[in-house]
Amino acid sequence: MDTLLRTPNNLEFLHGFGVKVSAFSSVKSQKFGAKKFCEGLGSRSVCVKASSSALLELVPETKKENLDFELPMYDPSKGVVVDLAVVGGGPAGLAVAQQVSEAGLSVCSIDPNPKLIWPNNYGVWVDEFEAMDLLDCLDATWSGATVYIDDNTTKDLNRPYGRVNRKQLKSKMMQKCILNGVKFHQAKVIKVIHEESKSMLICNDGITIQATVVLDATGFSRSLVQYDKPYNPGYQVAYGILAEVEEHPFDVNKMVFMDWRDSHLKNNVELKERNSRIPTFLYAMPFSSNRIFLEETSLVARPGLGMDDIQERMVARLSHLGIKVKSIEEDEHCVIPMGGPLPVLPQRVVGIGGTAGMVHPSTGYMVARTLAAAPVVANAIIQYLSSERSHSGDELSAAVWKDLWPIERRRQREFFCFGMDILLKLDLPATRRFFDAFFDLEPRYWHGFLSSRLFLPELIVFGLSLFSHASNTSRLEIMTKGTLPLVHMINNLLQDKE
């Protein structure tokens, strides 16, 4: 949905299916390519009689695209202790680097490929980027969105949606970082050694970088930020293609936020039953009458669905919709861990984004939330580094963690995890009933829920409103499937104190 992110972890959590996770291959359109990323796919029809493997043969070779300007590199011979070392050059890391450096503090950004344009596909609500003055970083917008509950029920969402221009967003951030004096180091951090007032980052090229504060912005690797509780999240899994098609049935002025219809599976009993147990939906961004981004998505499951299963469902759906793929510009494998415990709070390494547990546990949304949190992290770092009073490394990082995860944000996340635990238990009919009620709510409620703008008192009102809008069947499902998650949430809320 909002963030389609790679994870370096192997995919043992998938239903008996191991596959290397790829991300977008940002390339010019090619008609054919030899890249194969999956074995043992089903032979359901697509493009009339074409098999799913025939669709995959249209996937082009991966070609990495880099920014075309020079970066000021970190000079290890000087042995200086930088104020902030940011590990990871994604949106979250660069946003913090940019804002901390604007205050005149020294920053080093460490990433194995600092000039590589992000391979991830980001979709956001336009109002979220407008609030951060980032409208110039959207390369396509739609006046609204559509949700297909089933063949007879459609929801029209009057909320503009946009696709992030990855190159523009990264270029804008990098240029500001360069202007502010940020230095870059092309390497992977393999270890961090902490002393009282500084930390030493050991890189895989043998270079050691010293910093007062270390920020882990590496996504879901959890390589630097520590966890002390069992990690058992739900997983959002998706497969997407940016394709040239002969035609498609969607309104080019609206994106398809969710399509829960399953009429494309009526002739495949086994696949229809699988989809009924753990449903998937179509997410689509039509750029023109013959160019469209299509993605089959499992909202959340534990364990996550196998990529082969997702692709088989997508192929059946496209065939049923009469979408004949002529060529594929980019393809994307998406695996997003959702929910699970927060990292140890506080700890010496500061985190942001996926490594700090900031993915929305009910939706998989993160990019807008993370970019909005960047000033919070940056301001905390600036405040404590600029203080006349000397702080130890542990004191400083504890203060930053407190600002990133205040009690109201932790309570909000607990409610979102409660929502995820209910969604994990819903089959297709129950999921449809849930979203039928969800998108009937006043816009301020579903807007606020999806954009992480509601806090616990408002979330309680949101929950009561959702329950009142639900059908009797859906109310019964929420009560029976949500009782244990509700008890778990209340227990966690009572234990979590300032």
Curated annotation (Swiss-Prot):
Changing residue 127 to A: Reduces catalytic activity 2-fold. It catalyses: a carotenoid psi-end group = a carotenoid beta-end derivative; all-trans-lycopene = gamma-carotene; gamma-carotene = all-trans-beta-carotene; all-trans-neurosporene = beta-zeacarotene. Binds 1 FAD per subunit non-covalently. Residues 1-79 form a transit peptide. It comes from the Eukaryota. A motif (FLEET motif) lies at residues 293-297. Pfam families: Lycopene_cycl. Pathway: Carotenoid biosynthesis; beta-carotene biosynthesis; Carotenoid biosynthesis; beta-zeacarotene biosynthesis. GO terms for biological process: beta-carotene biosynthetic process; beta-zeacarotene biosynthetic process; carotene biosynthetic process; ubiquinone biosynthetic process; xanthophyll biosynthetic process. GO terms for cellular component: chloroplast; chromoplast; mitochondrion. Gene3D superfamilies: FAD/NAD(P)-binding domain. Its EC number is 5.5.1.19. Disulfide bonds: none annotated. Catalyzes the double cyclization reaction which converts lycopene to beta-carotene. Catalyzes the double cyclization reaction which converts neurosporene to 7,8-dihydro-beta-carotene. Belongs to the lycopene cyclase family. NCBIfam families: carotene-cycl. This is Lycopene beta cyclase, chloroplastic/chromoplastic. It comes from Capsicum annuum. The gene is LCY1.
